């Protein structure tokens, strides 16, 4: 019972494997061994095919197929000529088909010896000599009691030398019997010409017989799936194999005599099943052993063939849709099926030619002929033989498909260490050369940068190279090796410190170690940058001189007015022209400060955490506007030294500059940024306020100049408001950065927080409440002189506090730059925090600018419409400039920098143009004289032109 369960499980697994195998092989015919491009089928309705041919049985011997047809005609087919006749489809040549004679009764089985063809029919045994149609002999054993009850097995005839065997069984008991005839026996052919050999009782109803002609063994299968091994020389049994997984008859089999392997079919799952199991046995003269089993699709496996060289099996089976030819390798793999041009009846025999790779399948009324592919890679490329799926290459080839030609004629590349043979050519190693890799050389021939010392085959490199093969550059000497600026600046990582007269490692911002005030990098003189700095300083200087120069007469006039007020008790009322001049002067002054504000925005944009050229920040070696947004000297001497690792191969001609990077460029630690900014802010306050304070102190002791005291007081407050407004962005950025510095040191966080609250938040709030006064107060001369710079350019009744919104815009931009300052590396493209920070900064700044522009459009706060349109233009340009920062995220963008520079140049030109327009609008006697002079010149030129025309 247990063995039956095991057998059933094995059968079930085999069925599933067969279904899976064919589910994939039917659609992939290229995997099948049969070549589908050349299948030819010859049928009885084709020209030349024997009209009476009908092959229910047949035998193959010496490349010929012998068969007796249903009309008892005997035919012989020369298989070797099938290729020639497959070309034109004509099989009618007598060299191919030979009809010899007729037999009295339709045969059931046949066998062929060297001299005769034997057939066995119901009740008779027949033989005929090859080529002699008159030699038919028959014997009738129906009346012979000994043989009358025999049932002959279909296609159960075989031959071994001169012995012929027909497989039969007794009708009553099913016992297996072999009818034996010796072809060389003399005498009359009759009942005495053959004898009966009873087989083992375990074999019932024999169904197939397969012969190994080399060892003289016959493998007899029965209807129960058992196999008897029979020695045809000794006429004796050797062994019996019983397989519990096969419970139905054994059909055809085929043997590989060289390897002593038997491949035999067995019906799996019952007679009506379409699954056939193929068992693989290894046998000897004394034993038989099961090695492996696999399943194929189909039933009634009547014939099989084998390619004994390549290792392919062919089976003819039947399915519900008709007959098919199945090909596999000897393990059951690489399976495929072919049904095209296949007859719908059971096959009689299969002939396989391993040399020509052709296969012939014989059916009762047709012959299938085709070629099959080799299962060896590339059919061994024509340079070897396929041996059971493995190439046995010729002596001068190697590889799985014998595709690689050995270098036997090249002395095999003079050894495995000298080179490698590839397809008949030697590819030498780096230390050998020549057709056979027989010539020694230096490794890689020193890469062309040295000579070979043949004493020990080592490279002697030139002065610029080093290494075993001279493939490495000699590292440059340290920067300190260079003693003049020209040679120093020729190195990409060296800079020249003019003060010390030393060459040091660094970048555009200064040396990596220490500090240098006069630092040159890349070139000694940056002409374009210095020219830009000179233009900026010239413009700022001119505007400052104009502002100061026009202030002195106004202050003198106001001092007289204060003196008059002290005498009469009433401040003198200004004339219409004086009021107009003062109003337009205020508008002109505001446009000058707008010009300065635009420069500050460029500085602020330069602190966004993306790559900008260093010259965009450092005007010259002497000026840097990262301090307060104006060109000031880079820094004071630092209190400590800061250093970074050096890299001979780095080139920092382009450098990231956030506030953190700027702090690094100062040559100090995180504690130094805020004090440095405050130093310049304090210095700026001192430069302007100290002289005024001294003047105030002196005037206080002079009774005759007491009316000047009010003027100086007003000017002190006015200058203080201007400086607080100007320094707002720079100081607030530094304070914001100080609060988030990685040091988390109270010495920098607390001062930063105090400045942030008092200056960053407190100043706009103080201005809001300061300007919350009646309109009459706004026109008061004293109040106006002190705080007029905050509101005189706005509409006094409705928008005089609009300046607070300007401070809110500056507050947002400064804080987002300061708190998001970080120390990124110059790696592209930017990722992670390096990518997020500039995006956030740009988005927030753009939102602040857009919000400010919306307020401008809604309120239209300016009296001067030129100023309003200037603000519109500058806001649009600044939004674009800030957004262009993002063009540097993936890589430094020259186009982004160029566009930013061009539109900022346009913005500065617009500021200057608005300044000139405001000046021309002043209704003063001086301006009138200038206009009158210009008009006279124009009239004179026009008159001269008219005279010239008349003369012509």
UniProtKB/Swiss-Prot annotation:
Keyword field: Cell adhesion, Cell membrane, Disulfide bond, EGF-like domain, Glycoprotein, Membrane, Phagocytosis, Signal, Transmembrane, Transmembrane helix
Paired cysteines (S-S): 442-452, 446-459, 461-470
Localization of this protein: Cell membrane
Topological domain ranges for the Cytoplasmic compartment: 549-591, 700-722, 774-801, 859-868, 919-952
Region forming the signal peptide: 1-25
InterPro entries according to UniProt: Dev_Signal_Modulators, EGF-like_dom, EGF_extracell, LE_dom
Record: glycosylation sites: 78, 182, 231, 243, 412, 456
Chief location: membrane
Membrane topology: Multi-pass membrane protein
Residue ranges that the UniProt entry lists as topological domain Extracellular: 26-527, 613-678, 744-752, 823-837, 890-897
Alphabetical list of Gene3D superfamilies matching this protein: Laminin (2.10.25.10)
Ranges that cross the membrane: 528-548, 592-612, 679-699, 723-743, 753-773, 802-822, 838-858, 869-889, 898-918
GO cellular component: plasma membrane
PROSITE patterns: EGF_1, EGF_3
GO BP of this protein: actin filament organization; cell morphogenesis; cell-substrate adhesion; mitotic cytokinesis; phagocytosis; protein localization to cell surface; protein stabilization
Source organism superkingdom: Eukaryota
UniProt entry tagged with the keyword Transmembrane: yes
The keyword Membrane appears for this protein: yes
Residue stretches making up the EGF-like domain: 438-471
Role of this protein: Involved in substrate adhesion, myosin-independent cytokinesis, organization of actin cytoskeleton, and phagocytosis.
PANTHER family per the UniProt record, alphabetical: EGF-LIKE-DOMAIN, MULTIPLE 7, EGF-LIKE-DOMAIN, MULTIPLE 7, 8
Name by which UniProt lists this protein: Substrate-adhesion molecule
Taxonomic source organism: Dictyostelium discoideum (Social amoeba)
């Amino acid at each position: 019972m247990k063995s039956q369960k095991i057998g059933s499980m094995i059968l079930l697994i085999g069925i599933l494997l067969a279904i899976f195998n064919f589910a994939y092989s039917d659609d992939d015919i290229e995997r099948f061994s049969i070549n589908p491009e050349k299948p030819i089928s010859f049928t009885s309705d084709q020209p030349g095919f024997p009209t009476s041919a009908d092959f229910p049985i047949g035998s193959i011997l010496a490349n010929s197929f012998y068969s007796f047809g249903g009309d008892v005609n005997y035919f012989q087919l020369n298989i070797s000529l099938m290729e020639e006749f497959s070309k034109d489809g004509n099989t009618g040549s007598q060299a191919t088909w030979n009809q010899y004679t007729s037999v009295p009764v339709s045969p059931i089985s046949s066998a062929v010896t060297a001299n005769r063809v034997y057939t066995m029919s119901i009740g008779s045994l027949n033989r005929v000599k090859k080529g002699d149609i008159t030699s038919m002999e028959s014997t009738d054993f129906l009346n012979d009691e000994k043989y009358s009850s025999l049932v002959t097995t279909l296609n159960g005839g075989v031959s071994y030398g001169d012995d012929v065997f027909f497989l039969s069984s007794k009708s009553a008991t099913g016992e297996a019997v072999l009818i034996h005839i010796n072809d060389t026996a003399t005498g009359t052919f009759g009942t005495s010409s053959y004898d009966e050999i009873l087989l083992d009782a375990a074999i019932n109803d024999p169904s197939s017989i397969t012969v190994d002609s080399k060892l003289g063994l016959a493998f007899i299968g029965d209807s129960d799936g058992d196999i008897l091994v029979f020695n045809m020389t000794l006429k004796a049994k050797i062994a019996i194999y019983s397989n519990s997984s096969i419970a139905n008859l054994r059909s055809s089999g085929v043997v590989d005599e060289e390897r002593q392997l038997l491949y035999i079919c067995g019906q799996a799952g019952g007679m009506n099943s379409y699954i056939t199991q193929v068992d693989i046995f290894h046998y000897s003269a004394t034993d038989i052993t099961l090695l492996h089993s696999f399943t194929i699709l189909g039933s009634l496996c009547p014939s099989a063939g084998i390619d004994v060289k390549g290792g392919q099996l062919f089976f003819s089976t039947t399915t519900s849709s008709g007959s098919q030819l199945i090909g596999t390798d000897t393990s059951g793999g690489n399976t495929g099926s072919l049904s095209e041009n296949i007859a719908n009846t059971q096959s009689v025999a299969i002939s396989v030619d391993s040399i020509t790779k052709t296969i012939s399948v014989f059916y009762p009324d047709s012959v299938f002929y085709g070629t099959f592919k080799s299962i060896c890679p590339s059919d061994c490329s024509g340079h070897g033989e396929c041996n059971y799926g493995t190439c046995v290459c010729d002596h001068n080839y190697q590889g799985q498909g014998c595709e690689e030609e050995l270098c036997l004629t090249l002395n095999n590349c003079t050894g495995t260490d000298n080179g490698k043979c590839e397809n008949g050519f030697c590819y030498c190693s780096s230390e050998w050369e020549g057709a056979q890799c027989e010539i020694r050389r230096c490794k890689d021939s020193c890469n062309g940068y040295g000579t070979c010392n043949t004493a020990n085959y080592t490279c002697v490199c030139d002065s610029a190279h080093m290494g075993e093969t001279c493939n490495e550059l000699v590292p440059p000497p340290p920067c300190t090796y260079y003693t003049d600026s020209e040679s120093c600046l020729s190195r990409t990582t060296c800079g020249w410190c003019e003060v010390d007269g030393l060459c040091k490692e660094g970048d555009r911002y200064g040396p990596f170690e220490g500090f240098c005030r006069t630092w040159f990098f890349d070139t000694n003189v940056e002409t374009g940058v210095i020219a830009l700095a000179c233009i900026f300083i010239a413009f700022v200087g001119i505007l400052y001189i104009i502002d100061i120069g026009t202030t002195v007469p106004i202050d003198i006039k106001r001092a007289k007015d204060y003196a008059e007020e002290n005498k009469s008790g009433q401040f003198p009322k200004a004339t219409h022209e004086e009021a107009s001049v003062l109003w337009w002067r205020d508008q002109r002054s505001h446009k000058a400060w707008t010009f300065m504000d635009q420069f500050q925005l460029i500085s602020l944009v330069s602190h966004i955490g993306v790559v900008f050229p260093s010259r965009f920040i450092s005007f010259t070696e002497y000026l840097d506007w990262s301090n307060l947004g104006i060109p000031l000297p880079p820094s004071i001497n630092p209190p400590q030294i800061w250093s970074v690792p050096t890299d001979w191969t780095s080139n920092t001609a382009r450098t990231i500059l956030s506030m953190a990077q700027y702090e690094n460029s100062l040559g100090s630690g995180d504690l130094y940024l805020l004090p440095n900014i405050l130093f310049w802010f304090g210095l700026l306050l001192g430069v302007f306020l100290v002289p005024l304070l001294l003047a105030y102190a002196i005037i206080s002791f002079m009774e005759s100049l007491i009316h000047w005291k009010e003027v100086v007081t007003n000017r002190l407050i006015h200058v203080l408001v201007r400086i607080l407004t100007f320094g707002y962005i720079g100081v607030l950025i530094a304070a914001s950065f100080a609060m988030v510095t990685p040091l988390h040191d109270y010495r920098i966080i607390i001062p930063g927080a105090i400045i942030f609250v008092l200056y960053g938040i407190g100043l706009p709030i103080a201005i809001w409440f300061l300007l919350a006064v009646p309109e009459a107060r706004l026109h008061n001369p004293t109040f106006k002189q002190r705080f007029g710079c905050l509101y005189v350019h706005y509409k006094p009744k409705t928008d005089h506090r609009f300046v607070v919104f300007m401070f809110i815009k500056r507050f947002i931009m400064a804080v987002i730059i300061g708190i998001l300052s970080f120390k990124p590396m110059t790696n592209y493209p930017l990722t992670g925090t390096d990518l997020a920070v500039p995006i956030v900064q740009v988005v927030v700044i753009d939102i602040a600018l857009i919000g400010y522009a919306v307020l401008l459009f809604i309120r239209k706060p300016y009296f001067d419409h030129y100023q309003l349109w200037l603000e519109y233009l500058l806001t649009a340009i600044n939004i674009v400039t800030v957004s262009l920062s993002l063009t540097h995220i993936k890589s430094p963008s020259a186009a982004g920098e160029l566009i930013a520079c061009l539109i900022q140049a346009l913005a500065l030109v617009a500021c200057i143009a608005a300044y000139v327009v405001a000046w021309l609008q002043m209704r003063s006697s001086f301006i009138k004289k200038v206009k009158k002079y210009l008009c006279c010149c124009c009239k004179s030129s026009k008159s001269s032109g008219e005279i010239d025309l008349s003369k012509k």
